[in-house]
């Protein structure tokens, strides 16, 4: 079963994609950047941006009755691998079950943000 997932508690997609899909009980989120869904603002600094990205992932998971403890794989994108340690500090507070993860540095992220997180 394929189910489109959308919540106002996470930022709307900024392109031709969805926030997430649930497929046979598994949730696949699109990458969540640190945009505050209430006002569209982006906080400054990697710690605040990682926090907002995690909150956005959490809002999507909550919308389908799931949570961080059910996530088994994430892909994280950083604009600067120098932010790896600071990003991990925040990430570890949310993803306490330590899902499998890939984390890569990329040249640019949408809206010039410092991080993006997608989860399964």
Predicted regions and their residues:
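Short, polar/acidic, helix-capping and beta-turn segments at strand->helix junctions
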Residues: 2-120
